[in-house]
Amino acid sequence: MNVIYPLAVPKGRRLCCEVCEAPAERVCAACTVTYYCGVVHQKADWDSIHEKICQLLIPLRTSMPFYNSEEERQHGLQQLQQRQKYLIEFCYTIAQKYLFEGKHEDAVPAALQSLRFRVKLYGLSSVELVPAYLLLAEASLGLGRIVQAEEYLFQAQWTVLKSTDCSNATHSLLHRNLGLLYIAKKNYEEARYHLANDIYFASCAFGTEDIRTSGGYFHLANIFYDLKKLDLADTLYTKVSEIWHAYLNNHYQVLSQAHIQQMDLLGKLFENDTGLDEAQEAEAIRILTSILNIRESTSDKAPQKTIFVLKILVMFYYLMMNSSKAQEYGMRALSLAKEQQLDVHEQSTIQELLSLISTEDHPIT
């Protein structure tokens, strides 16, 4: 039974909705430790994150057992903290994935869950809360709730300002989200300032040619594209494409060499791998398909640039073991190369990609 009866709740105990913190009227029947104000929020949370972590919440929201020694108690506490850290990262990754897929409503419960565990583990004033605030801000922007997004961003900014040990990666995320806020408000001057800072801090943390830096270049390119400064936009889109090409081509070349032997020491086929988590894969799809759409709108002027992005997508989906998508983009690249009568070497390179895909024995996912 999902309904909560008020008289059955111990006196002084307040049960709150997992999504909005209003007084709870329902409980999840599967875990019995998660509460909701109504069916709408229960379904929203279930579809977003709760289904994936339902049983994992039970040991975190029930009393710790009695331990016979201090050593056992410390071990139990360490296990509890490890579970919390795992759920922080898991919920964060899922929320990021939803955002890159444009599912802003679904991202909110997952981001709230990540924030909730961060507060319990690190406290209310910790800089560790900032990534979760930024997820909630980005989700709010996607839903058109600019005032709410500003509140989350200012909370994140204030936390960073108070911190003495904030990482370059966190500074990068903060400036990227501030850039997105000002893009939504059509204040492109401020947006460019924050995205430039995003690129700087990301470069300090990961390097100028890292895929984690490419997001800043991409958003900056979008600003120049909207401002009709097409040469600047083109340069930055090319930069982003080259970063992703270098990353994916490295994985692709390693895999191609491995396939010469076909089998590993255990007699199993080598598995394709992008080296990315779910959120990064979703980000790659969003960035590369956006650039492809722009390239295709001007493919008559620079077909090589369109083919270059198509080849990146071929490698990406091949590494994801999605042969049908890889073949689709490969055929589009080959068709465009023939249509534009590009050199034979370009066509043969695409043919090699298609040949490797056609001999791949992995199932389509």
From Swiss-Prot:
One of its GO terms (molecular function) is zinc ion binding. GO terms for biological process: flagellated sperm motility; sperm axoneme assembly. Its main location: other. Zn(2+) 1 binds at residues 17, 20, 37, 41. SUPFAM superfamilies: HIT/MYND zinc finger-like, TPR-like. Keywords: Cell projection, Cilium, Disease variant, Flagellum, Metal-binding, Repeat, TPR repeat, Zinc, Zinc-finger. InterPro entries: TPR-like_helical_dom_sf (IPR011990), Zinc_finger_MYND_domain (IPR053248), Znf_MYND (IPR002893). Expressed predominantly in the testis. Pfam families: zf-MYND (PF01753). Zn(2+) 2 binds at residues 28, 31, 50, 54. A zinc finger (MYND-type) spans 17-54. PROSITE patterns: ZF_MYND_1, ZF_MYND_2. It is found in: Cell projection, Cilium, Flagellum. GO terms for cellular component: sperm flagellum. TPR repeats lie at residues 172-205, 214-247. It is linked to Loss-of-function variants in ZMYND12 may play a role in male infertility characterized by severe asthenozoospermia with over 5% of the spermatozoa displaying flagellar abnormalities such as short, absent, coiled, bent, or irregular flagella. Required for sperm flagellum function and male fertility. This is Zinc finger MYND domain-containing protein 12. It comes from Homo sapiens. The lineage of its organism: Eukaryota, Metazoa, Chordata, Craniata, Vertebrata.
